Swiss-Prot record:
This is Tegument protein UL46 homolog. Keywords: Host cytoplasm, Host membrane, Host-virus interaction, Membrane, Modulation of host cell apoptosis by virus, Transcription, Transcription regulation, Transmembrane, Transmembrane helix, Virion, Virion tegument. Residues 1-31 are annotated as: Disordered. One of its GO terms (cellular component) is host cell membrane. It is found in: Virion tegument; Host cytoplasm; Host membrane. It is a multi-pass membrane protein. The chain crosses the membrane at residues 299-319, 339-359.
């Protein structure tokens, strides 16, 4: 039976020998074999090869990536707003030959999303979190008021009686994060004495909420389809939102300065201004600066006209609120003060949630279209403004890390993952050159490496590694900071030795001036940087002048040299440069010297003798009359990023520095 089948199969096969070499015998000796055996040998060659070729499903890299993109697309489509996937949007973008989204299309998508579907899942999730707490209005009131008293005691040193905790920390954080966002009406409805003013205030707050929601919606729908290629129009919009965020955080610090001063005056508390006024510019000037010179306006292209109008609406509402809180009277007694406090905390938590929403949206994807990715100066300024606010007012608010935030806002993160995967699949499994530069700017794949400094032979060969890590409220906002501080001529992390290390958890008595200790200059504080060194205390670093003399960082020119040695020379991002004169010459960095979020400047570098830290951003463009001279805000302190421990302070009059006691 088998031989008959083999002979018939072989006869049909002979007619096709010329078309497939695999049917021919590969061994001349096979001709002497019996017919069934000889035919089976030729058949087996074809059967096995075709079976392997047609039946094997081991995925190739391209197939695996394609399958992953398909699965990710299905999941993403179920989470994102239907308007983002609409036929209208896709048809318009397909007809374009660039990676920009016309603003008319952005506005159209915003209008079509009538019920705010872009945030529906997000709002439902945080509403469930609040519902699980089962807190009444009185419970929410207590959380806001108690949190403020703790914050005031921490920031001013005033003797404020703080009641014991009635709510656990998790519930308290949930309230401070989300309660003001989902509230249909304010908890404190009468913060001012006049009923008319209270009504006006509630109306302005409602306008503010609508403007904040419009900015968030605009940002959601302004994204192009390809994050791995540049988008000039989107870059301007991202910069406008980042500048708007930095301006908003500056206003919030000014607002808290006013509220804190009025509370202390109403209750006749001893107001110890430990850190000085935290906002250096009054709201009129601060907001006017953005409205006139913001990125959307200064670009002059009109590609972000609607966005500029939307951010202007929000800032205008803040300006109107400033007038009320600065001039209108509060209700009498402790109850009146408490009502004002709760209203203030509601406003601050609402704004902080809004601005951290915008920043987190940048960090999970929108920064791809910034100028140099995360090295965009406007994005860095927004991060610095948030960090500055959290440093001074971190006790009053709560901040979600980006990793926690994407659990709530899953759709945007998945959308960017899908878009990047599709682009990599289209480019043969490799990211574009532009996207590779974005990743380099994020430092996720190009960490900073510093060459270890050799220790003198008289000292042990064991490495001496010191890190100063901030686990403070600022850390919850932008990640922990590993600070390496150069004091005198040696590296140290001794917090108690001097005030050169930022320490937000320091007790109040440690912030008071110490007349018996001279403050050592703080020289270098760099984010996300670890310095692995071998060093001996009081031993000079091997960084000296050409004549062999050691470098003293308290002198401006010496400090500048050490700073350059530490951070590396300014260079093009595509090249690596080494300074042959330095023992720290093996430095790989993707940013210029000015691209660091945190940087402290010694007093002598700017011509001051007082050991004060200057906030360069706040003093930018300072002129006579810029310093707020209202009774609520003392002009005797300059704004700073860290607590100042010194007997004297510096103020500014007509751009002329003066020291006083």
């Amino acid at each position: 039976m088998f031989s008959r089948f083999a002979r018939s199969f072989s006869s049909d096969d002979r007619t096709r020998k010329s078309y497939d070499g695999s049917y021919q015998s590969f061994n001349a000796g096979e001709r002497d074999l019996p017919t069934p055996t000889r035919d089976w040998c030729s058949i087996s060659q074809r059967i096995t090869s075709e079976r392997v070729r047609d039946g094997c499903l081991i995925p190739t890299p391209g197939e695996a990536l394609e399958t992953a993109v398909k699965a990710l697309s299905e999941k993403t489509d179920s989470l994102t707003s239907p308007v983002l996937q609409s036929t209208e949007r896709h048809s318009v973008l397909l007809g374009l030959h660039h990676n920009n989204v016309p603003e008319s299309l952005v506005v159209s998508c915003m209008s079509n999303d009538v019920h705010d579907g872009f945030m529906q899942r997000y709002m439902e999730t945080i509403q469930r979190c609040l519902d699980d707490l089962k807190l009444s209005g009185d419970g929410l009131w207590w959380v806001y008021e108690n949190t403020y008293w703790q914050y005031l005691k921490y920031t001013t040193g005033a003797e404020v009686p703080v009641t014991s905790e009635k709510v656990n920390k998790k519930s308290k954080s949930t309230v401070l994060l989300f309660s003001s966002v989902v509230a249909n009406k304010p908890i404190s409805r009468h913060p001012f004495k006049s009923k008319v003013i209270n009504s006006d205030y509630r109306g302005i707050c409602q306008e503010l909420r609508e403007a904040l929601g419009a900015v968030q919606k605009y940002m959601y729908f302004m994204r192009p389809d390809d994050p791995t290629n540049p988008s000039p129009d989107t870059r301007i919009r991202v910069q406008e939102i980042a500048a708007y965020t930095a301006t908003g955080y500056g206003w919030m610090l000014w607002f808290l300065d006013v509220v804190d001063a009025r509370v202390c005056r109403h209750l006749k508390l001893q107001f110890r201004r430990i850190r000085g006024p935290r906002a250096s510019v009054i709201p009129d000037d601060l907001l006017r600066r953005h409205l006139k010179t913001g990125p959307a306006v200064s670009a002059g292209t009109g590609v972000a006209f609607i966005l500029a109008a939307t951010t202007a609406s929000a800032l205008t509402a803040l300006l109107r609120i400033s007038v009320l809180w600065r001039k209108e009277e509060w209700r009498d007694g402790l109850n009146g003060t408490a009502a004002a406090i709760v209203a203030a905390v509601e406003l601050i938590t609402l704004l902080h949630h809004h601005f951290q929403y915008l920043i987190n949206m940048m960090l999970i994807g929108y920064a791809c279209w910034g100028d140099g990715g995360l090295n965009d100066p406007y994005i860095l300024k927004a991060l610095r403004a948030q960090g500055r606010f959290l440093y001074f007012a971190g006790q009053l608010v709560r901040t979600m890390s980006t990793h926690s935030w994407v659990v709530l806002e899953t759709s945007t993160h998945m959308w960017f993952s899908r878009a990047v995967a599709q682009s990599i699949l289209a480019h043969g499994g490799k990211p574009t050159k532009y996207y590779a530069q974005v990743l380099a700017a994020s430092k996720r794949y190009t960490p900073l490496h510093l060459r270890r400094i050799s220790e003198p032979s008289s000292v042990s060969d064991q490495p001496y590694i010191r890190f100063n890590r901030l686990g403070s409220p600022i850390g919850t906002g932008i990640g922990n900071l590993e600070c390496v501080c150069l004091t005198g001529n040696y590296l140290s992390d001794d917090v108690n030795a001097s005030s050169h290390v930022i320490n937000t958890e320091a007790p109040l008595n440690s912030i008071a001036p110490d007349t018996n200790r001279q403050r050592t200059s703080r020289v270098l504080v760099r984010p996300d940087t670890g310095l692995d060194v071998t060093v001996r205390k009081n031993h000079c670093l091997d960084i000296g002048h050409t004549d062999g003399s050691p470098v003293d960082p308290t002198y401006p020119d010496h400090y500048t040299r050490i700073k350059a040695e530490y951070e590396g020379p300014v260079r093009d991002e595509s090249n690596t440069m080494f300074d042959q004169r330095s023992d720290l010459r093996h430095i790989e960095t993707q940013a210029s010297l000015n691209d660091h979020v945190y940087e402290n400047i010694p007093p002598k570098e700017v011509g001051f003798n007082s050991s004060s830290d200057l906030d360069v951003d706040s003093l930018n463009g300072y002129t006579s009359g810029d310093m707020h001279t209202d009774d609520d805000l003392s002009p005797d302190f300059i704004p700073n990023d860290v607590p100042v421990r010194c007997k004297t302070t510096v103020t500014f009059r007509k751009n002329t520095p003066k020291s006083h006691h």
